[in-house]
Amino acid sequence: MGLLGPDGLVTRGDIRYMDQNILDIPEKEKRKIRGAGIGMIFQDAGASLCPIRTIGEQIYESMCAHTKITRSEAKTRAMDLFDKLNFKDSQRVWDSYPFELSGGMNQRAGIAIAMLMNPPILFADEPTSALDVSVQRQVVREMLKLRELFGTAIVIVTHDIGVVRAMADTLLVLKNGKTVEYGTADRVLDHPRDPYTRKLLEAVPKLQRKVRV
């Protein structure tokens, strides 16, 4: 995504997308990939959205970066996606500034913005961490629905084992930036082989209590 500046510069290895190394292509070509080829959902949508522009304006600007489109056409596409995601008041979301929406609604709007160009790959960086449990469940359902509707491959970065169980087909466990375990989600979660993976799973609180009869 190119968001980290010099300190986050990749100095070794490749980032492969559609048979090309993203690190080797010009910035102009990278811009075509971001959004249209690879979408991104950030951990805190409120921080990633511009506070002085409405959601509708930001959607229109995002779409204009990739295709020639009128404001009315952009709105029609956005409203259609809002409806598919079961937004209760699509017009209000379109007209609102981020600070006028709840954290959960901002996150849902961020998901919609990430999917407007129907990218084949969607990165989700801790998309539920800043949300309460009920909104987390809703956001997970919406991402699963997007995968079903559009065939999107979702790469989710999370420490939430519940989200992993709900969404993941394949699971990669990292420790200090290195892979310690990789396999199907069911295998890794139910039969972990690496000590670090086992410790992660043991750290999940167990909702159990003893009942005397």
Name each model feature, range by range.
Residues L9-N21:
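Conserved ABC transporter NBD signature motif
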Residues L116-P120:
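A short, proline-enriched helix->beta-strand linker immediately N-terminal to the Walker B motif
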Residues L122-D125:
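Catalytic Walker B motif of ABC-type/P-loop ATPase nucleotide-binding domains
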Residues R137-F150, G162:
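Helical segment within the ABC ATPase nucleotide-binding domain
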Residues V164-A166:
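A short, surface-exposed alpha-helical micro-motif characterized by mixed small hydrophobic
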Residues Y182-G183, H191:
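ABC ATPase "signature
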